[in-house]
UniProtKB/Swiss-Prot annotation:
<dbReference type="GO" id="GO:0005737">
    <property type="term" value="C:cytoplasm"/>
</dbReference>
<dbReference type="Pfam" id="PF08574">
    <property type="entry name" value="Iwr1"/>
</dbReference>
<comment type="function">
    <text>Directs RNA polymerase II nuclear import.</text>
</comment>
<dbReference type="InterPro" id="IPR013883">
    <property type="entry name" value="TF_Iwr1_dom"/>
</dbReference>
<protein>
    <recommendedName>
        <fullName>Probable RNA polymerase II nuclear localization protein SLC7A6OS</fullName>
    </recommendedName>
</protein>
<dbReference type="InterPro" id="IPR040218">
    <property type="entry name" value="SLC7A6OS"/>
</dbReference>
<feature type="compositionally biased region" description="Acidic residues">
    <location>
        <begin position="232"/>
        <end position="255"/>
    </location>
</feature>
<dbReference type="GO" id="GO:0015031">
    <property type="term" value="P:protein transport"/>
</dbReference>
<feature type="region of interest" description="Disordered">
    <location>
        <begin position="232"/>
        <end position="272"/>
    </location>
</feature>
<keyword id="KW-0539">Nucleus</keyword>
<comment type="similarity">
    <text>Belongs to the IWR1/SLC7A6OS family.</text>
</comment>
<dbReference type="GO" id="GO:0005634">
    <property type="term" value="C:nucleus"/>
</dbReference>
<keyword id="KW-0813">Transport</keyword>
<keyword id="KW-0963">Cytoplasm</keyword>
<dbReference type="GO" id="GO:0032502">
    <property type="term" value="P:developmental process"/>
</dbReference>
<keyword id="KW-0653">Protein transport</keyword>
<feature type="compositionally biased region" description="Basic and acidic residues">
    <location>
        <begin position="78"/>
        <end position="96"/>
    </location>
</feature>
Length: 313
């Protein structure tokens, strides 16, 4: 099959996810055993964000596939698929309250008969399924022009978190300056300004286009859940990068530290020889000076004795 596409409708002020993980049931083939997993996960990467749902998706999807080499790090390795699936199942209930994706329509390529409206919350029971909404009607009209597209298309809506998760403390923390309580009204002026500034586009919607390359398991059906892909360790290289060591950070007690380098034995022997030579030279100079003084004194004595004898005669 060709690439599958998720078109997610979200408010302009919300942040899009870099990637989505879609989990769905997989149809077993005759060659597969019963022990093989009946659930498969697929990663959808963010290709582009468009302002209108009527914009053609072909160019964005094909451009994203052409630069797929720079996005390969978003694909989870085969060893980590099982771990990701278990972690997502464990935290599915909590994450669902934070970010919910509701499917409003599903369209297979080049087949109008197979197009199905899927108005339900992913992972919820049939009691939570709402009736047809305005989003479904808009998506149905918008996807009529994409029925002949060469990829499977799912229209979704990113719903906002529940209000109980967004509630803040009724009494904000007191701000003190030099033990004096500050007036909070001066701080809320800027917040009001920001709210009025963003009021123009807070209710506007944009559409995030996510794509996934051809799947080996056929069409995507029986979707279990769609969650943001948040495994940060899968998005970076597992090889640690060498850290820079600065001179003021190295340990002087380490054996390989440059400050602890000792001179070679040959240099030490040569130093000792020259030190002995200089010491011997100093002793010889001292002895020669002492002998000269003794000779000088004896000479003076002899001269003095000769002068005394001359006076006697």
């Amino acid at each position: 099959m060709e690439a599958a596409v998720l078109r997610v409708k979200r408010k302009r002020g919300a942040d899009p996810a870099d990637a989505l993980i879609l989990s769905c049931k997989r149809i077993r083939t005759e060659d597969e055993t019963k022990e093989s997993s009946a659930v498969t996960t697929q990663v959808f990467r963010l290709a582009a964000t468009v302002k209108s749902e009527n914009e053609p998706l072909h160019k964005y999807v094909r451009e994203a596939i052409s630069r797929n080499q720079s996005c390969l790090t978003l694909r989870p390795s085969s060893e980590s698929k099982q771990r990701i699936q278990e972690e997502l199942r464990a935290s599915k209930e909590a994450e669902r309250q934070v970010s919910r994706y509701r499917i409003i329509s599903s369209h297979r390529p080049n087949s109008e008969e197979d197009n199905v409206g899927a108005s339900h919350l992913i992972g919820c029971s049939s009691q939570d399924v709402p009736s047809e909404t305005q989003d479904e009607a808009e998506a149905t009209e918008a996807t009529k022009s994409h029925i002949s597209s060469p990829f499977q298309l799912f229209d979704m809506v990113q719903e906002e978190p529940e209000q109980k998760y967004l509630e803040k403390d009724s009494e904000p923390e007191t701000i003190l300056c030099n033990s004096i309580k500050m007036i909070r009204e001066h701080l809320t002026v800027s917040e009001a300004g920001q709210e009025s500034e963003h009021r123009e586009y807070v209710d506007e919607y944009v559409y995030d286009i996510y794509y996934s390359e051809a799947s080996q398991h056929g069409w995507i059906q029986d979707i279990l859940y769609v969650q943001p892909y948040t495994e940060e360790q899968e998005l970076v290289s597992e090889e640690p990068e060498p850290e820079e060591i600065y001179e003021d950070e190295d340990d002087e007690n380490e054996e390989n530290n440059w400050r602890n380098d000792y001179p070679d034995e040959e240099d030490s022997d040569r130093e000792e020889r020259y030190i002995g030579y200089y010491e011997d030279g100093d002793e010889e100079e001292k002895s020669a000076g002492h002998a000269w003084k003794m000779y000088h004194r004896s000479s003076l004595r002899e001269i003095g004795d000769d002068d005394e004898n001359a006076d006697l005669y």
